[in-house]
Amino acid sequence: MSDVLLKVEDLTRRFVSGDESLTVLNHINLEIKRGEMVAIVGASGSGKSTLMNVLGCLDKPSSGRYFINGQDVSTLESDQLAELRREYFGFIFQRYHLLGDLTAVANVEVPAVYAGVPHRQRTERAQSLLARLGLEDRLTHKPSQLSGGQQQRVSVARALMNGGEVILADEPTGALDSHSGQEMMALLKELHQLGHTIILVTHDMNVANFADRIIEIKDGEIIADTLNAQVVINEQAAKTPSASFHRPAQAVSKWWKWDSFIDALKMALLAMSSHRMRTFLTMLGIIIGIASVVSVVALGNGSQQQILSNISSMGTNTIDVRPGKGFGDRRSGRVKTLTADDAKSLESLPFVDSVTPSLSNSLTVRYANQDATASVEGVGEDYFRVRGYEIAKGQFWDEESVNSLAQEAVIDDNTRKEMFADRNPIGEVIFLGSLPVRIVGVTQKKEDAFGNSDALKIWVPYTTMSGRMMGQRYLNGITVRIDENAPSAAVEQSIINLLKMRHGTEDFFTINTDTIRQSIEKTTATMTLLISAIAVISLIVGGIGVMNIMLVSVTERTKEIGVRMAVGARQADILRQFLIEAVLVCLCGGIAGIGLAFLIGFAFSTSGSSFQMIYSMNSIIWAFICSTLIGIAFGFLPARNAAKLDPIEALARD
């Protein structure tokens, strides 16, 4: 194995700005062996930092070739360069570049996260490195709680985390006092003795004199490359690398993906918690949008259910036949062709379950010294089945009562309360106009389809109503109940055809509750869709807010992105981290929005509304899906911008 670790051949680096080109490195040739301690010295603007960036795979040459351990890396892509940074290099920056939200241990762990080292193993190694550097009592301290010298030692530990075969130190004493600076140089010298290849970049000859070899650079060219007076090259270390830079065992890909995801999730939570108010305001658009969608769907479901329930109170699967051409026909009162025989003939049609004739009038009902106005309806024995009424007390009359014109009545719960209070009305006699009738049954309370739930209702056999009370042979209407799964439109047409044949003309109209129900369902669905579309607009606005804040976050955390790239993060790692953060913000907003929707439902139910909001599990699931998709869609652009940052520019950003 060759002792040459890093080799540069005819390397040039130029920067182009518009029509101008600036050559920073000009045909550099350089070899650095394993175990050397090299100082690159030059004034500001000499090109020394650019050379360090190329050597550390943070930058690529414009021309020429660069070899690491015999491999030409001058044309590699960014992700391949990131892999080399993880495997070979550890960076010590003048300004430390520690991540302010992480503890000392967590900062040291960062390179190992991107190297795929399992959590437990990397934590143990980070703690061990910090202990060796005298920071065993500062493991859980954040950078703001450490002195400058302590922060620099944390950065040294981070550089050694993945082995640090080559340590690149950029002005390592520049931000330290003289005592801490001496300690840092002693530490680097110790690492050199352990076999690490140390490359110092400095303008200070006092620092450079710690190196075995001093390379002077001026105007992008190497003007001197000399050995120090007391050259001590650790030949043995070059042949046998020290245990201090043995790399931790690499994990399989699932560990790499999982730990990277967990790390990105933790960083997202830290970023959110460090800017709580901004995070909340970012979520607010998502919260309002999700709450609006879920609440609107719940309101639509609740109102639809209430309307359908009201329609059901008119009768389940019923078709009503009324005289005239339709509602509002002024001549309907003169149509006297609907008869009981028509009702009997309708019973013979297929899919017909039961039929009831009906006559109605408003009469005064009297009992003892009480009187009130009630709606009195003459109906057949099947009326209560057709309309879905249930008995509370007593019984309904039968066919014999209808045939015998029995003076029997069934009253509703409102009539019972009005006329009898707490007394049992069964067997009592009341007067309907001048006709006495005996109460045989009381129906259970039932909401009226049109909201007139306080009206008094009394039912008698239609024959009694026709023969004893009104003296008319024609009916006010016929109600037909059809089978549960019958095609209501076809049955309705059969009813029309039969009655047209019997009457010789169509002097009646029909009311199909199934048609009404379908129309209401379509109308409700359309209104729900319309209002939901408006709510979706607020979701989009919220998504734009997320994107804006994430763009701000990328700008604020540019240096953090540069540090992560320097220690080996690929573009995909940075993209994933910021994308997870955007999705997490939107998911939290979605959860809060669903919670707000339930609070709205609770307030709505306690406000005395006539119906309840009915929440749909589908709408809740879609709310989660939408919030996730919004996070991905509106978080992708900021995340991509973060991933495409140049690590050198990111590290230089203030």
UniProtKB/Swiss-Prot annotation:
Highest taxon, organism lineage: Bacteria
Membrane topology note: Multi-pass membrane protein
Residues annotated as binding ATP: G42, A43, S44, G45, S46, G47, K48, S49
Domain ABC transporter residue range list: 6-244
UniProt main location, coarse: membrane
Broadest EC class assigned to this enzyme: translocase
GO molecular function ontology, one term from the record: ATP binding
Any one GO biological process: response to antibiotic
TM spans (from-to): 280-300, 529-549, 584-604, 619-639
UniProt cross-references to SMART domains, sorted A to Z: AAA
Pfam families from the UniProt entry: ABC_tran, FtsX, MacB_PCD
Keywords: Antibiotic resistance, ATP-binding, Cell inner membrane, Cell membrane, Membrane, Nucleotide-binding, Translocase, Transmembrane, Transmembrane helix, Transport
PROSITE patterns: ABC_TRANSPORTER_1 (PS00211), ABC_TRANSPORTER_2 (PS50893), MACB (PS51267)
Cell compartments where the protein resides: Cell inner membrane
InterPro entries: AAA+_ATPase (IPR003593), ABC3_permease_C (IPR003838), ABC_transporter-like_ATP-bd (IPR003439), ABC_transporter-like_CS (IPR017871), MacB-like_ATP-bd (IPR017911), MacB_PCD (IPR025857), Macrolide_Exporter_MacB (IPR050250), P-loop_NTPase (IPR027417)
EC number: 7.6.2.-
A GO CC term attached to the entry: plasma membrane
Signal peptide location: none
Subunit structure: Homodimer. Part of the tripartite efflux system MacAB-TolC, which is composed of an inner membrane transporter, MacB, a periplasmic membrane fusion protein, MacA, and an outer membrane component, TolC. The complex forms a large protein conduit and can translocate molecules across both the inner and outer membranes. Interacts with MacA.
Family, as annotated: Belongs to the ABC transporter superfamily. Macrolide exporter (TC 3.A.1.122) family.
Described function: Part of the tripartite efflux system MacAB-TolC. MacB is a non-canonical ABC transporter that contains transmembrane domains (TMD), which form a pore in the inner membrane, and an ATP-binding domain (NBD), which is responsible for energy generation. Confers resistance against macrolides.
Protein's name according to its UniProt entry: Macrolide export ATP-binding/permease protein MacB
Species name: Vibrio parahaemolyticus serotype O3:K6 (strain RIMD 2210633)
